[in-house]
Regions:
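Short amphipathic alpha-helices in soluble, non-transmembrane regions
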Residues: 26-30, 66-77
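N-terminal acidic leader/helix
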Residues: 2-36
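Short, intrinsically disordered low-complexity segments
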Residues: 38-70
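Short, structured coil/loop segments at alpha-helix boundaries
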Residues: 16-19, 54, 61-64, 79-80
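Intrinsic-disorder/low-complexity coil detector
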Residues: 2, 6, 60-61, 72
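Conserved short beta-strand edge segments in small beta-sheet-based binding/regulatory domains
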Residues: 39-40, 73-81
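Short, low-complexity, intrinsically disordered N-terminal peptides in bacterial proteins
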Residues: 1-6, 77-81
Length: 81
């Protein structure tokens, strides 16, 4: 994955019976990472596509892409979609 000039949504997927708790825990660490790294303009939340799946998403301005990519998101999508 490489940075883009548009805001991007990065996603980390979690599966199984503990997926929701794991995703909530990851979200807390993601928010702490923003503060520690001085990142601004990021938004994040949780989503679920089906039973046994939860994901953390992070909408990132282009200036924060490189820092977020260090966290190895599983997928990404254009924020305009």
């Amino acid at each position: 994955m490489s940075p883009t000039s548009q805001p991007t949504i990065y996603v980390w997927d979690f599966f199984g019976p503990n997926a929701e708790g794991t995703a909530r825990h990851y979200l807390r660490h993601l928010e702490q990472y923003w503060v520690k790294s001085g990142l601004e303009g990021c938004e994040a939340g949780l989503e679920s596509e089906r039973a046994g799946h939860h994901a953390v998403w992070c909408r990132t301005p282009p200036a924060a892409d490189a820092a977020i990519l260090q966290l190895k998101p599983k997928r990404r999508r254009n924020a305009a979609e």
